[in-house]
Every structure is written in structure tokens, then in C-alpha cells.
Amino acid sequence: MNSKLNLNWNLVDEARKSAKKIAADAQVFVDAHSTVTVERTICRLLGIDGIDEFEVPLPNVVVDFIKENGNISLGVAKYLGNAMLETGLKPQEIAERVAKKELDITKMKWHDDFEIKLALKEIAEANVERIKSNRAKREEYLNVYGDKKGPYIYVIVATGNIYEDVTQAVAAARQGADVIAVIRTTGQSLLDYVPYGATTEGFGGTMATQENFRIMRKALDEVGVELKRYIRLCNYCSGLCMPEIAAMGALERLDMMLNDALYGILFRDINMKRTLVDQFFSRVINGFAGVIINTGEDNYLTTADAIEEAHTVLASQFINEQFALVAGLPEEQMGLGHAFEMHPDTKNGFLLELAQAQMAREIFPKAPLKYM
């Protein structure tokens, strides 16, 4: 790419090295810790789904039970694998019995770690294969229909009712939309559980649930066959359940997910240690599933002046890039965020915005940048 801005690449390299150091320092903490959300994600990746009689998701039931009665720092997988050896049951059956108070997986005789890993291996690999086959299915669609050259047109639906969202999404696809983003209901990022099943009520958006993902994915596949185009599906995994929603998206073949390393800290007041651990595991999953992440730099400019704080956008892009690389997410899957949020009366406003956009394009040449 020919540079149009005559950037000082020594400064670019210096900034990238600083961001890399930030990510490496944080990763020392991340590698030594888990969170309840990460443990619930492990439950989901071992096939646990559904709710108890009080509509509490079974992954929450299992993790909370171990927290209260055992030692969650050993990891939920160890308890589940051990229970499988003791009972001969699958993780889903174990979770259901824990929910009914018919089984206490914290009081069982411990088996050898190697045996526990062996017991878990088959089930873990089956769900990994499901994610791999979803990725292969996406690639198959793109091979048959081809992919769009140039920018994707990104359209948001947010009625609160997944079935009405489907109607709008199908109409948008027929009008040329390439990506359908289903905005989450207000406040879902602060729920410490993922709701279950199809939902028909929401406020400013629709609940992100695995069943809602499945319903929308099916509808977009059907209209895609009609239009001979692959329509991408986007949802949001920022907040308290980042890796859980990333796993659900991987299992239902979502194509894009909002995933910012710092968003929960800066804009949702979520514990920063938890956020950094959660974003890492969620990005590992996104990377493996071939999901393009969209980062949240547009949020900076909704809370600060776009000219005075323009540098914060670039700083965040650098940091998001480095956290993504540590998680194994390739540059081609980093939808680094930007937005046009200047006052319309700003002198030379469009020129300033174009320069900032071109700068992002030159500094992150492989990233599918997100402009809003």
C-alpha cells in the first residue's frame, strides 16, 4: 500500500511496541487466573445447556454449586470429569442432577488427573469438531457464492422480538445488506448469566441467547440461498459473559462479534481483572471459530470530543490489536473500530476524519476496519 500521509514509521513501531508491552504485562495475570464466566464457558463447551426449575442456566447452577461447596479454583472441568468417572453420566446429565440436588460433585472420591482428562476428551473434541464444521460450512458458502469485494454493508436490527428481527433482517438482506447485527437488549452486558431460549421482549434490542442465534442464522442461510450470497451474522459478546457468548456464537456459526478488550472496564465499570481474563478466552474462541471481532473505539467518541481525544482511538486500536494477537486472533479477523462523530460545523471536519481513517488503514493494513 502506498502511504498517503507520510507517517513516521518509527513512531508507529514505538507505539506498537508499547502496546505489546501492555498486553504482555497483562497476560502474565491472565495466564494465572480464571473467572466464573470462563468456567461457565467450559461447561457450555462440554455440552451443558438448559435451565433449572427457576430458569437459572445450568452452567451457572454447576459453577455456583462448586463455588459454594467445593474449590472452584481447581476448575469446573476437573469436577465434571471426575463425576463422569464416578457416575458414568455425561456432563449434561450431571448438571441436571446437580440442579435437582440429587448429586454432590464436590464430595466424590478423586480420580487421577490423567483419567479425568481422558474422560473429558471425547466430549470436548465433539464440540470442537462442531465449531470446526461451522467454520468449514461458512467457507463452503463463500466458495460457492463468492465474497463481496470492498466494504460490507452492516445493518442493525433491534426490535426485542427475535421473530420480528428475522423479518427485518431478511428484508435488509434483500435490499443489499451484507452483515446483520442484532443489538442486545439494554443492560444485558451487566447480566452475570446468559438468558435461555427464544425471546420476544427487549428494550432497545433483543436478548442474546443461543436459540436466538440459531433462529437468525437459519433465516439468513435461507435468504442467502435465495439471493446466492452469504449473509453474515453479528452479535455482541462484551460485558460480564464475554467468553460464554463467544462460545454460543461459535456453536451457532455467527460471523462477527463485538469484542473489545477494554470496553467493560471503561464503559461498564466491570472489574478490570475479570474483563482481561474474559476477553482473552473469548478471543481464543473467536479466533478458532473464524469470527471477525469488532472493537469498540466508536464508544470513545460518544463520551469525548472527537478532535481533542482522537489519539485515544488510535491508542485503543493498538492495544486491541496486541491483546488479539496474544489470543491467537489473526489480523484478518480484527475489525478495529472507528466512527465519524465530529460536529458537522467543524472546519475541515471531513478532511480530519478522512485522515484519521486513512491512518488506521495504513497502520493496520490487514484489519477489516469498522466505520460507524
Feature locations, PLM:
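Long, compositionally biased, glycine/small-hydrophobic-enriched stretches that function as flexible linkers
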Residues: 1-163, 171-176, 181-215, 237-246, ...
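Alpha-helix-loop-beta-strand connector modules within alpha/beta enzyme cores
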Residues: 139-146, 194-233, 276-293, 316-326, ...
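Structural preference for beta-strand elements that scaffold enzyme active sites
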Residues: 150-158, 179-181, 226-234, 255-258, ...
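Surface-exposed charge patches
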Residues: 170, 247, 358, 362
